[in-house]
């Protein structure tokens, strides 16, 4: 309601615009129900054409089903990679969302198989265990700093947990996943005496600040 509110936006961009774009080139079914409502709503749209809008019984929360992506735009469809590759991209994105929002339960089903299902219990360590496995979850060091202008929370891995690329490095600003070469180099420099050359640490660090920050780092 005020200009200052723009400095503390917790959403992740133009979600409505993205959904509209997806609905224009696929068959989309949405089932949604607020926790305080008696019934839910089922909404179906195919190629931007509204097919159904009806009340139904549904659990709390929102489910999106996207089928036949680019079915009506074959020129775009040919640029899609294999189903396995595209599914991996989606899984990676949802893992990042889950890590930055541990209080939300995410469930991702691909070809009738559950690829990701988080509890939403708010515990970051449980999420790391679920996504990365027992070995990493058992070798974590907690980070918890609260200052006047920002807070930093999450986990870093002991030096025994490393890999040959930066896929284990996860950084978030105000709930948004970012990639920052400056931040990565700073963390890696701190591990310099503990890791072999071309080995990279595990990190899951969430930076939170109500002050204006440039988030165009990813």
Residue ranges and their predicted role:
Residues 1-209, 213, 218:
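N-terminal phosphate-binding caps/lids of nucleotide- and nucleic-acid-binding domains
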């Amino acid at each position: 309601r005020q200009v200052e509110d723009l400095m503390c936006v917790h959403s992740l961009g133009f979600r409505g615009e993205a959904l509209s774009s997806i609905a224009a080139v696929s068959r989309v079914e949405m089932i949604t129900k607020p926790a305080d409502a008696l019934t839910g709503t089922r909404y179906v749209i195919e190629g931007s054409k509204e097919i159904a809008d009806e009340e139904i019984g549904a659990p709390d929360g929102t489910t999106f089903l996207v089928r036949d992506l680019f079915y009506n735009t074959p020129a775009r469809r040919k640029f899609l990679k294999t189903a396995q590759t595209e599914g991996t991209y989606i899984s990676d994105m949802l893992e990042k969302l889950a890590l930055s929002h541990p209080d939300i339960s995410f469930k991702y089903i691909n070809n009738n198989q559950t690829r990701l299902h988080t509890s939403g219990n708010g515990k970051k360590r449980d999420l790391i265990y679920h996504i990365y496995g027992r070995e990493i979850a058992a070798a974590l060091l907690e980070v918890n700093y609260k200052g006047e202008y920002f807070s930093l929370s999450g986990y870093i891995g002991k030096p025994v947990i490393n890999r040959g690329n930066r896929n284990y490095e996860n950084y978030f600003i105000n709930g948004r996943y970012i990639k920052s070469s400056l931040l990565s180099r700073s963390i890696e420099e701190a591990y310099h005496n503990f890791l072999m050359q071309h080995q990279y640490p595990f990190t899951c660090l969430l930076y939170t600040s109500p002050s204006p920050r440039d988030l165009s780092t990813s």
